[in-house]
Amino acid sequence: SAGVRPYRNVSPLSALTERTNLEITYAQGCDIDRTTPPIETPILSSPIEVDFFNAHSIGGEIAAHKTYSRADFKFFGSPTKGVDNHTYSFSGKATITPEVTGKHELRLVQSGKTRIRINNEVIIDATEGDFGKGDDFFGMGSAEITAEIDLEAGNEVPIEIEFSSEGAILMLGCRIGLKPIMERDLLQEAEDLAAKSDAAVVIVGTNDDWETEGRDRDSFFLPGDQVELIERVSAANSKTIVVVNTGGPHDMTWIDTPNAVLNIGFAGQELGEALVDILLGEKDPSGRMPTTVPARYEHSPAYLNYPGENSVVRYGEGLYIGYRWFTARHLEPAVP
């Protein structure tokens, strides 16, 4: 499999703001992060300059140098030309500029051994000890390791990452995230904003942290407080459009709550522009749904068959896979 970072990526908010003369306001609504996203722009205020060494300890001759735009290092074999397939270490240096003042949570997932310094102070030292197993790195990574740190908005500080492949197998590396600890009522902020707006667009869904290869989805339901967000915004504004951005079917028992629902899937780098085309009435969303969405989870054959026994799932519906299951059992789906 492969992942590609697009050359151009415009968010729906940016596209809507740039293409209309309307007053566009924004509220986060809720937090759906399964794990903390990697540090990147705008918090990452300079590229991560990484020196690789062909040893488990940092030092000596530099085997290779590389620049990264986000704190997400995952390697099958050699990270780059000149570096050993398995025995290596690296030192990465960059600067970060927090967007808000207050407590932040630094999070690490690793397959190997990692030490992180911020402003020349060791914040996480995960070079010794058992940190448990997580789902990331195809099940070879640790559970998230966390620490708190106070940071000031706009104050640029150095961050240094030290990593060793010692003790890791097959997939090596680390992912480092940093996010402010929210003390705001995000749902209330969204509800209040919707109440004083002419119309509301609520974008819900998942991301590659929830839907990815290498493991099953955790749940059939939208993560976080997204259903409550839909309900509260729809109650506050009768002209609410809910945009569902997921890679597969999710619970939609709330489908009659908003004024309109648009399912867009993971549409790629032109998602923002395409969505605005539809919202402004310039294009007709005339596509077909690739999957059937059950009216309730209990109507899905997965409810009966998953997770199975001894890591084996039996497809008990037999030939009635997909829409045939609902047709054969006269089950009216939420979305055909």
Where are these regions (language model features)?
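Surface-exposed amphipathic alpha-helices with a cationic face
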Residues: T17, I230-S238
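A short, aliphatic-rich alpha-helical micro-motif
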Residues: A194-A195, S234, I255
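Secreted, periplasmic, or luminal enzymes acting at the cell surface/secretory milieu
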Residues: S1-R70, N245-P336
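Short glycine-rich anion-binding loops that position phosphate/pyrophosphate groups of nucleotides
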Residues: T206-D209
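Short, well-ordered alpha-helix to beta-strand connector turns
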Residues: S197-D198, N237, P258
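Acidic/polar, compositionally biased interaction segments
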Residues: D31-D198, G214-D216, F221-E228
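Extended, hydrophobic alpha-helical segments in both membrane/secreted and soluble proteins
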Residues: D225-I230, T240, V261, L275
